[in-house]
């Protein structure tokens, strides 16, 4: 199963490869996608699954128990979005790349160790060199003392201990919002971890 919701939000020459396009995977893969991220319509909850006939029967059974269908106007809106001109995608990626580059520079300036993302709209950082017990303590400090919300990195690991030194920032905001966050982050003076 592959979640391909960020297929159009790529940077620095990164290429999207659909898992089902790989030889031998077409009948084994379930591709999940939606209009949420690419079209900034997260509240609509319109998505889809693409799979072989042998898998779709089971998907439909599970779907029937978990949700009802999306409202018709939302389905029509999704169709209009999906039929929109292709120049939308490069423009979207360029706008997010600008935000990524801006936030990355600020985070590095402040002292975060940044993992350079080539897709999506998040930046994972390492804070293991800072004087925090773990990612949760750092995230609470940032929101309570600095006024910038992050997500503890351990949330994204099947073995949470592997993410205890990481926090994730998101940049799908207006530039003015990111500039305000940058001003707050520049007041952050992290202590270095002792020993």
What residues fall within each predicted segment?
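PLP-dependent class I/II
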Residues: 1-195
């Amino acid at each position: 199963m592959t979640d391909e919701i960020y297929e159009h939000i790529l940077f620095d020459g990164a290429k999207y490869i659909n898992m089902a396009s790989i030889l031998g995977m077409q009948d084994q893969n379930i591709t999940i996608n939606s209009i949420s991220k690419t079209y900034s319509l997260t509240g609509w909850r319109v998505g889809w699954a693409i799979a072989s006939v042998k898998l779709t029967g089971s998907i439909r059974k599970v779907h029937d128990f978990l949700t009802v269908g999306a409202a018709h106007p939302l389905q029509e809106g999704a169709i209009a979005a999906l039929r929109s001109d292709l120049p939308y995608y490069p423009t979207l990626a360029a706008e997010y790349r600008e935000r990524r580059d801006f936030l990355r520079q600020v985070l590095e300036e402040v002292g975060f160790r940044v993992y350079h993302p080539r897709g999506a709209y998040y930046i994972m950082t390492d804070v293991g060199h800072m004087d925090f017990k773990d990612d949760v303590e750092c995230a609470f400090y940032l929101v309570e003392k600095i006024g910038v919300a992050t997500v503890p990195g351990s949330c994204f690991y099947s073995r949470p201990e592997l993410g205890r030194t990481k926090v994730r920032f998101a940049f799908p905001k207006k530039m003015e919002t990111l500039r305000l966050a940058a001003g707050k982050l520049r007041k952050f003076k992290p202590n270095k971890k002792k020993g």
